[in-house]
């Protein structure tokens, strides 16, 4: 119904809190009535126990890339672990409270499926079904999904792209014959994903104690909407750069005020190869004051016809554009940046291609660079073997370092 609100004074009272304590305090208003605060605090600690660093996420002040928020220290080396580990623990608690098993259903362009399966496979009261586009995700991510050996995990390859997989999932949820099945979405349709991701925007502000722009590699707009959520919960920060690869539907939206579906094109950052940003509808729901009928009318002819936002009433769309800006880059830009900076910056050896969409786009004079730019590193490069193949032709020693064991 509404976002919980935190004053600046309350937010800064969490300055010395651990990440788990911060998450507990910020997210408990969403959970209150389902769990006690003590039980929720215990659940959060257990959920993040599988991360490789005690702080869960890490801010890294780099010489050449600026301030980078490392979100890849979870069990599948992708930012989705931060939300998925918490979501799976909450689903298990729900199954326990109702004494009924839950079927988790989701579609993935790579990161989501791997993280969801890893998070859910340990819970006997959860079965998980993940649809992924055949030969359109990285080989590493496909192996992560198909080699769990868990009896409650069911990965399914689907002909087409991510949008086709997601459409199958949406149809299953709507089919009348499935109304008695306890399906739960693992995609960012699930609010837990959004609320969990909002936490590290607060974490960043509390660590640097100054205004910042969050540069977010973007496909489905979930992460960007989590930043909007943090803003509506009371966090003050300058704005968000929606950084896209050559699948630039979101960039064209903010640049030209037109939302138009295009065919997804395979890229070196496959987790971002998405042509319909589902979470953008959430933002519109807020703009239209939670009027679902208006939103349904707006999307009645989409994607057959693009949606134009020039005629939104009042300052609603302009307020959105004041907070969100965007840009895009192609595969060549990503490769050139990696090659240019590889020997200068060790962090490049452990981050995936998606970071460079954020890095490149915020360094293209879109923003006032006197502000701190917080690039978000979403995954490790082992998820993107196309990078290895391309870089191998350019800088062989780069590939040797990237794939070498620790």
Cite the ranges covered by each PLM segment.
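PLP-dependent amino-acid enzyme catalytic core
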Residues: 1-406
